[in-house]
Amino acid sequence: MTEASLNEAATAAITAFDGADNLEELAALRRDHLGDNAPIPQARRSLGTIPKDQRKDAGRFVNMALGRVEKHFAQVKAQLEEKRNREVLEQERVDVTVPTTRTQVGALHPITILNEQIADIFVGMGWEVAEGPEVEAEYFNFDALNFLPDHPARTLQDTFHIGPEGSRQVLRTHTSPVQIRSMLDREVPIYIACPGRVFRTDELDATHTPVFHQIEGLAVDKGLTMAHLRGTLDHLARELFGPETKTRMRSNYFPFTEPSAEVDVWFPNKKGGAGWIEWGGCGMVNPNVLRAVGIDPEEYSGFAFGMGIERTLQFRNGLSDMRDMVEGDVRFTLPFGIQA
């Protein structure tokens, strides 16, 4: 194949490539002009049949023609790819000025909302929020809180024990271990709120769940009395349930407080009624608990209280079934919006 015929074949290929409208057409034209049966590839294969003294020049002509065609093909391909990308971007372009339907906004879970609301109340009183591990040593969960070795709360019927046997590790049954850790780590006076998730071997039903949330409070200072405890609970209750809320205390027993009491609340509910409802437990910190963390009960006193977040949400918002809070159905969460 002569130099002139090679140039002619190259020019024909270049002209054909310029006429391609898209990448698919360009690929088909490449097969026509650079495929096995096209003139330039055939000329390249025939180089072996040319006399040696002519082969060098013939090979140079073939490579020059092939190089022109390959270079132009790459240029046209780049142009068509850019064109295609512009078309795709144009098709996917979003006109942000066009009116559209309102995007559905998600909502925090009501337990999260209530947890944050309660924490904000304590922070507003100048208290700190303290947290601790959910897998806890028995010492912090029971021993330091004045639970006797044979207390029924330690049994497998009430507590999840973590293996191996004898490890003395449990899933915490309350957030009270955070109080112990805080008293060991902090200098008195101490005013902390302890929110968190706790675990007990309860069956899931309308009023119980094996995994739930608590908020506990602890104050340790000089001269604290039950009057300070009552005032703190009154303020918390009115912030949560409304200004008409009342509280009352009923004598009870807890290992970690002495004296101890159950606290009830009365408030007008969202269904138009009102009545007394058991809310949580409270009392003055047992002197044995203070001694366990190195605080002299002759110099300092303290009060503590705790209540369940799920139970608080349930009777405050008139919810009949606690299972709705744990099953993850978005239809339950959305009505609460961004505030409970």
From Swiss-Prot:
EC number: 6.1.1.20
Textual note on the cofactor: Binds 2 magnesium ions per tetramer.
GO molecular function (one): phenylalanine-tRNA ligase activity
Annotated InterPro entries: aa-tRNA-synth_II, aa-tRNA-synth_II/BPL/LPL, Phe-tRNA-synth_IIc_asu, Phe-tRNA_ligase_II_N, Phe_tRNA_ligase_alpha1_bac, Phenylalanyl-tRNA_Synthase, tRNA-bd_arm
Catalyzed reactions per annotation: tRNA(Phe) + L-phenylalanine + ATP = L-phenylalanyl-tRNA(Phe) + AMP + diphosphate + H(+)
Class of the enzyme per the UniProt entry, highest EC level: ligase
Swiss-Prot/TrEMBL keywords: Aminoacyl-tRNA synthetase, ATP-binding, Cytoplasm, Ligase, Magnesium, Metal-binding, Nucleotide-binding, Protein biosynthesis
Keyword Nuclease annotated: no
One Pfam family in the UniProt entry: Phe_tRNA-synt_N
Listed SUPFAM superfamilies: Class II aaRS and biotin synthetases, tRNA-binding arm
A single Gene Ontology CC term: cytoplasm
Positions that bind Mg(2+): E258
GO BP terms: phenylalanyl-tRNA aminoacylation
Subcellular location: Cytoplasm
Cytoplasm found in the keyword field: yes
Subunit structure, interactors included: Tetramer of two alpha and two beta subunits.
HAMAP family on file: Phe_tRNA_synth_alpha1
NCBIfam families: pheS
Entry similarity comment: Belongs to the class-II aminoacyl-tRNA synthetase family. Phe-tRNA synthetase alpha subunit type 1 subfamily.
Protein name: Phenylalanine--tRNA ligase alpha subunit
Organism encoding this protein: Corynebacterium efficiens (strain DSM 44549 / YS-314 / AJ 12310 / JCM 11189 / NBRC 100395)
Lineage per the UniProt record: Bacteria, Bacillati, Actinomycetota, Actinomycetes, Mycobacteriales
Annotated gene: pheS
